[in-house]
């Protein structure tokens, strides 16, 4: 059984090796694979918007540089007086390059269409 040293006792080389291992096998492997294979991911954000795009870079805080992003959300249109039952309207916009701060990320999914096509 290998002894696990606390992070404070690791050399910079050991820290880098451990971080790379975590990025390749842990939850962040979804982002690692997206960067390596240039595949799309679907990101749910705290502002209740969804981002579908390609990850160019990321860090351990889930800060991301994204390209070719489609931002999607729903809005309730304003109603005049006396009108009822407003249907939500789906909206979207294209963003060619963006930086996404990690604290706004809730969930990251591999593109289900690309995953299904690969099977």
Swiss-Prot record:
Subcellular location: Nucleus; Cytoplasm, Cytosol
Record region (Disordered): 1-23
Domain Sm residue range list: 28-114
Keywords, sorted A to Z: Cytoplasm, mRNA processing, mRNA splicing, Nucleus, Ribonucleoprotein, Spliceosome
GO cellular component entries: catalytic step 2 spliceosome; cytosol; pICln-Sm protein complex; precatalytic spliceosome; small nuclear ribonucleoprotein complex; spliceosomal complex; U1 snRNP; U11/U12 snRNP
Role: Plays a role in pre-mRNA splicing as a core component of the spliceosomal U1, U2, U4 and U5 small nuclear ribonucleoproteins (snRNPs), the building blocks of the spliceosome.
Name the UniProt record assigns to this protein: Probable small nuclear ribonucleoprotein Sm D2
């Amino acid at each position: 059984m290998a002894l696990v040293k606390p992070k404070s006792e690791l050399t910079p080389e050991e820290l880098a090796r451990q971080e790379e291992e975590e990025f390749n096998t842990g939850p962040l492997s979804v982002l690692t694979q997206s960067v390596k294979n240039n595949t799309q991911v679907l990101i749910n954000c705290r502002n209740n918007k969804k981002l579908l795009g390609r990850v160019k870079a990321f860090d351990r805080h889930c800060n991301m540089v994204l390209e070719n992003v489609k931002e999607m959300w729903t809005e309730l249109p304003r109603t005049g007086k006396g009108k009822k039952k407003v249907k939500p309207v789906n909206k979207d916009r294209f963003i060619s390059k963006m930086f996404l701060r990690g604290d706004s990320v809730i969930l990251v999914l591999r593109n289900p269409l690309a995953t299904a096509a690969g099977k």
